[in-house]
């Protein structure tokens, strides 16, 4: 179904970006080449500073052939209605089911300073469809990434009622913390974020503490690591106050899982107009987490949401409308895995010189408990003019047990 993609398309991006603390003007050409079922998207970008000097790092392919991979934005085979399809690289606008767990997710929110490499693949065999999604395979070595699965069954052509189940897990929300040198100590805790052999510098003088292992020369180690102006060799070990080993991605995990069931029926389906009615049941679970040094403590939370009835309609491929009645219990919000999920999956702040880590659930549900409940109408409208201009608006009128929330 549908028209085949054009053999060639071109996207363009102009803006400014900060790389390694320096502001650059950015010109990006993003050609898309389609041959049969294969599509390749490229990212050809030039960065110039305010004096007009081009940054060479991205084009030093002779010394770093791996840079060629950075030029590939995505590789795609087939489309989502084909018997088998797969996409590798950038993932945008990903929704599982009716979006109660994941809606409009993108792994490109911090591009190009953070390049995530995702996988989205699936199949359609007769009445059965399946889909698998990984947000960033680079996170696999850092304790885990966001993984999504969907299975759907359509009763028949005469009765196109579809039943679906969705499962999403973020195996380690902490892997959203940046760790440039890959030593498992996030940059925010790492006194040497660009050197994988070093991490602690208690007195902040640029010389590492002892205890970094045999790969660090003795001549590099700080002779007064705690900065009290007494050489450590002449001091009792008990009097040398050094930082503890920093928070590590290897030893600490904070996960979340979501499970949902949905049922939908297309009342109308044509190029001009579509109308779908549906119902969806979603759950979210956040296991309790306590790190060995108690630097991070998260209480267990869970919640659920039911959307029934739900109605979605599109007109001429330009206007999209949705309306649903939602009933929410406990620590659940619709679209927990949303477009900005990678930005707020885990956040850090500094309080009294201490770095505090909070996973998204701790920020979103800090005023909730598992007996909180609300219900009400949610509606949204979107306008898309020829894929050039997009507008969207939403309305919610949710009545809680005690208060009324309008947005």
Regions found by a protein language model. Give the residues of each.
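Outer-membrane beta-barrel channel domains
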Residues: 2-10, 16-155, 160-165, 299-302, ...
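Non-catalytic interaction/regulatory modules that flank or connect domains
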Residues: 315, 373, 382-407
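Long, internal scaffold/assembly segments composed of regular secondary structure
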Residues: 230, 238-363
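Extracellular calcium-associated, cysteine-rich motifs in secreted modular proteins
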Residues: 177-240
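Solenoidal tandem-repeat scaffolds enriched in leucines and small polar residues
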Residues: 138-178, 192, 201, 239-268, ...
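Outer-membrane beta-barrel signature, preferentially recognizing the C-terminal barrel domain
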Residues: 124, 252-262, 366-375, 382
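Extended hydrophobic-aromatic, low-complexity segments
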Residues: 201, 321-322, 333-334, 389-393, ...
